[in-house]
Amino acid sequence: MTGFDIRERRNDIGLSQSKLSDITGIEQARISAYELGKLDLSVKEINKIANHLEKIDETAVLKLKKKRFQNSDHLDSIIAQRPRREFSKTKRNKEYLEVLKNLETQFTNPPKTGLKAVSFFAGCGGLCYGVKAAGFEIVATNELVENYKAIYELNFPNVNFLPNDVQEITKSDIDQILKNHKKIDLMVGGPPCQGFSLAGKRDVNDKRNTLFEYYLKIAEQIQPKVILIENVRLLTSMKDPNGSLVSKRILDTFEKMGYKSNFYNVNAKDYGVPQHRERVIFIAVRKDLKKSPSIAETKYGNSVNLFNSNPPYFTFGDAVSDLEFLESGETSKKDEHHWAVNHPEHVIRWLVDVPEGKSAHDNIDPNLRPPSGYNTTYKRQVWKEPAGTVATTYGMISGCRNVHPIATRALTTREALRLQSFPDTFKLTGNDGPIRTVIGNAVPPLLGFELAKFIKENYML
């Protein structure tokens, strides 16, 4: 969980740094500095904050504002007073589920290509899921956060884990990989970028500034045929503490390493993921292959090729319309990951009549508007459009575009997984807070598959 994530989640639930400090026992000054990117908290401290944020009941937090909502505990449920809403399967729900089933099949029984890949900053394995399904054997990986690593190991039980901290990976670790596997064809990963900023004013000594450098240093030792880096799209505008564009530094380093490289802005919805999710992808190709870097063509939505008309984007409804309809506080009897947070009644009243694509902040009646926040918060998704970006706060109704299009509640974990293109057989373990964080930060497996499949077909065969 980054400092930005903590600040965003605190603001969403109206929790001050001082209160968070009291709850966790972590000094407020340290929390503040971490949110500003000026120092690193330990993994133990970050996990402690994440767990406490998840456990905090929104009602308890909002009692701090009891003067505004002093009668909220005595309101009759407005949902119970109305006919129960419902939805039916969309025409393309079956098609989308077949896409996920095919992805699962290829992950379970991947093509026998003999191609080897390594992964760093693996998270729960979203990118690796797609890479394996495309026909690459993941022979080594690393992940710092134990909660995320536990989920990864459930789904990739035979992968060799390198030291959790990428800065602790030694030359002998790399030599052992090369000894065991002779060569590595593909290296993938998403080094964190919190040490950089748009203005280049972050602390020069911030350890996170070096994570990209460690990733590239490891790549130089391994010398894979192709290197892939995934990150937030904003990275292309970020600067290091010396004022240089991070993207240029990366490209220059690839050049010195003997690679041709470029970066591409992509949106996951163009590759079959039912979600607007903009990312930047760096592709570096070893010069001896005598090929230039490129990226997979889009497969869905408006096509730039007049002779190859792409099918429409998959939508929110296409992804989830076969699931049980749930209102606030309800739980599916069929799926342990499909349950809805029980939201305060006054929040339900703010949102119950809000149409798709609109926010409670847009309500004409000022008494039905949240007291603070932006109009992207308390906002409904749209059923017949790709979902907004699934964030780490998807279970918080006050978050950014987290409200279900039809039900008056935040998204469930199953819905978030579907919108991220994880097949239903993907396994989870741990507390809800870390699970939500790692799902919200994951690379959609379907995007990873299309990128890796293109790399295989254009640079490996």
What do the predicted segments below correspond to?
Residues 25-41:
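Recognition helix of helix-turn-helix/homeodomain-like DNA-binding domains
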Residues 27, 59, 69-139, 253, ...:
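S-adenosyl-L-methionine-dependent DNA methyltransferase catalytic core
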Residues 42-66:
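DNA major-groove recognition helix of helix-turn-helix/homeodomain DNA-binding modules
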Residues 70-223, 233-237, 243-245:
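Core alpha/beta nucleotide-donor-binding catalytic domains of modification enzymes
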Residues 128, 194-198, 235-238, 272-275, ...:
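Short catalytic/ligand-binding loop motif for oxyanion handling, primarily in non-cytosolic enzymes
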Residues 210-285:
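Conserved Class I SAM-dependent methyltransferase catalytic core
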